[in-house]
């Protein structure tokens, strides 16, 4: 069940199929290259209003407990900003930081990842299933990078933009 190397989570199939269905209703048959382009537009290239730039991750150990601090640089409608989040790992730290920075309440429902290519420079794909806890709306975000942490954080920003991009 691979699509141009992407192994979409089961729940994401319907979400993306709905996007393609709307296009098919307007123009008829949709070619595979156009499907990939729509995937890129919907998930990979969605950088508005929030565009992930970089993140510095620091782990702190206290006994057998770990705390992760993430300092994230991002763009908000083109303006460079920064926030800090603290959590039990990079995804949790960035999620908490985004909630505080943007005044949102989100829940990670699911997370998965896989290699898109092989070798030492392999690209990874990360899928994040998020829910807006205020409205109950859910969506997926996708990130790719040769760094799995960066792919995951891009996935969070992709999902946040899909949830809140049109409303703000």
Please state what every model-predicted region is.
Residues 1-168:
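Terminal or standalone catalytic/regulatory effector modules within metabolic enzymes
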